[in-house]
Regions:
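Hydrophobic helix-coil surface modules that form long, contiguous segments used
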Residues: 1-103, 132, 156-158, 165-169
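Second-shell loop/turn segments in exported
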Residues: 24-34, 119-120, 181-186
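Surface-exposed patches in mature extracellular/periplasmic domains of secreted proteins
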Residues: 53-61, 117-121, 145-150
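Active-site proximal loops enriched in glycine and acidic residues that flank catalytic Cys/His/Asp
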Residues: 63-65, 82, 113, 127, ...
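Catalytic Zn2+-binding segment of zinc metalloproteases
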Residues: 106-122, 140-141
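Active-site His/Glu-centered metal-binding helix of metallohydrolases
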Residues: 102, 106-111, 129, 133
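Short alpha-helical functional segments enriched in proximate histidine and acidic residues
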Residues: 45, 49, 109, 113, ...
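Acidic/His/Gly-enriched intrinsically disordered linker/tail segments
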Residues: 71, 127-187
Length: 187
C-alpha cells in the first residue's frame, strides 16, 4: 500500500491509506508501483477538477478471483476482477486498460456513491460520466496519454456494434424493478 494526502476547493483535506489486496498466490503479480501511481494521479486530478475532497475515510482496491464484473465501486473500496493482474510482466495495453478501470471506478466515489441517481433509469448518466472521466483522467494525468485512441478503437467501436443488434435499447428506459435494471446494463 501507501498513502495519499490532498485537498480540494472545498477547503477540506484528506489523508488516506491506500491498500491493495489480492489472494496470496498473486501477491507477486500486484504491480503495486503502477497501480498506486495511477491511484494517486486520479485522486489528485479529481480533487483539482471536482473541488470536493474525497468523501470516504479509506481507499482500498481488492483484486478477487472469479468475479463476474470487471470492477465495482463501493464507498472507499473498489473490487476488481483479478484478471487485471498478470503473472508475467504486464503489457502496456493491460496496464492502460487497468488504469482506465481504476479511474472509472474512482470517479464513482463522487458520482455514483456520494451523488447517486434516484433510480436505475438514470444509470446511463453515472456510467457514461465515469467512462468519460476515466478516459480523460488517464490521458491527462497518467503516462497513458493515448487513452482516447484506445477508447475510439475499443469502447466506442463496441458501443456502435451494440447499437446494431436487435437487443439495443433506449439510453433512458422504463425500469420498474431490479431485474429490468440488470437487463438494461451494458458492458
Amino acid at each position: 500500500g501507501g498513502s495519499w494526502e490532498g485537498s480540494a476547493g472545498d477547503g477540506n483535506t484528506a489523508s488516506l491509506q491506500l491498500r491493495l489486496l489480492c489472494r496470496r498466490a498473486l501477491a507477486d503479480s500486484m504491480d503495486s508501483d503502477d497501480i498506486l501511481a495511477v491511484t494517486r494521479a486520479g485522486l489528485d486530478h479529481y480533487h483539482k477538477h471536482y473541488g470536493y475532497t474525497f468523501p470516504w475515510g479509506s481507499y482500498d482496491q481488492i483484486f478477487v478471483p472469479e468475479y463476474n464484473l470487471g470492477a465495482m465501486e463501493n464507498p472507499g473500496c473498489i473490487t476488481f476482477n483479478e484478471n487485471y493482474l498478470s503473472r508475467d510482466t504486464p503489457s502496456f495495453a493491460l496496464r492502460q486498460k487497468r488504469a482506465n478501470t481504476i479511474l472509472h471506478e474512482m470517479c464513482h466515489m463522487w458520482f455514483g456513491d456520494l451523488v447517486t441517481p434516484a433510480w436505475w433509469e438514470n444509470l446511463w448518466l453515472k456510467e457514461s460520466f465515469a467512462e468519460n472521466q476515466g478516459t480523460t483522467t488517464a490521458a491527462e494525468a497518467t503516462i497513458y496519454t493515448g487513452e482516447w485512441a484506445s477508447f475510439a478503437i475499443g469502447r466506442k467501436a463496441w458501443a456502435l456494434a451494440q447499437d446494431q443488434y436487435p437487443t439495443t435499447h433506449p439510453i433512458v428506459a422504463d425500469i420498474p424493478d431490479i431485474p429490468a435494471a440488470k437487463n438494461n446494463f451494458d458492458g
